[in-house]
């Protein structure tokens, strides 16, 4: 992907501004330092100066590391490296915990959502807290 972006000129300048690039942090890379390292690697592979959205792929409820991971995400946002922060597959309990431990809500929660699985509780919770729902 990075080579294609660079070859087409879409990795910098005015062309870059016309794209929305999202990347996700793998579960095994959660944690403060490992999230920062993984992000740097993603930028290198994408050959970009920033991403439009960086997302936690899964809340890892049995080995909760999302708090430290989120703190790294906030650092990246504050530095202009990731413009929007999101999560994937977070249920209301996960979102509450993240908010209680960091004081922040994600901008987006990407969840499986379709006519046969509407996840009304998750959607309502996100709406109440100003979190956009992105369906996959």
Where are the language model's segments positioned?
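Active-site groove signature of glycoside hydrolases
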Residues: 46-63
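Beta/alpha (TIM)-barrel catalytic core signal, keyed to glycine-rich beta->alpha loops juxtaposed to Asp/Glu
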Residues: 58-136
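N-terminal binding-site loop/beta-alpha segment at the start of enzyme catalytic domains
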Residues: 2-19, 49, 72
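Active-site mouth loops of central-metabolism enzymes
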Residues: 23-34, 61-62
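Short loop/turn motifs at secondary-structure junctions
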Residues: 15, 47-50, 81, 104-105
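An active-site-proximal structural segment forming one wall of the substrate-binding cleft
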Residues: 31, 35-50
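Aromatic/hydrophobic pocket-lining residues that form the small-molecule binding cavity
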Residues: 1, 35, 39, 66-69
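Extended hydrophobic secondary-structure segments that form protein cores and membrane-embedded regions
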Residues: 20-24, 55, 110
């Amino acid at each position: 992907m990075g080579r294609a972006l660079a070859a087409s000129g879409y990795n910098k300048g005015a062309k870059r501004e016309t794209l929305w690039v999202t990347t996700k942090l793998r579960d095994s890379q959660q944690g403060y330092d490992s999230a920062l390292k993984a992000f740097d690697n993603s930028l290198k592979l994408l050959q970009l100066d920033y991403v439009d959205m960086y997302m936690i792929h899964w809340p890892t409820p049995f080995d909760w590391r999302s708090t430290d991971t989120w703190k790294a995400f906030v650092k990246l946002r504050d530095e202009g490296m990731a413009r929007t922060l999101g999560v994937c597959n977070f249920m209301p309990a996960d979102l509450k915990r993240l908010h209680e431990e960091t004081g922040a809500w994600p901008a987006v929660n990407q969840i499986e959502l379709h006519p046969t699985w509407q996840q009304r509780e998750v959607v309502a919770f996100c709406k109440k807290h100003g979190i956009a729902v992105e369906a996959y």
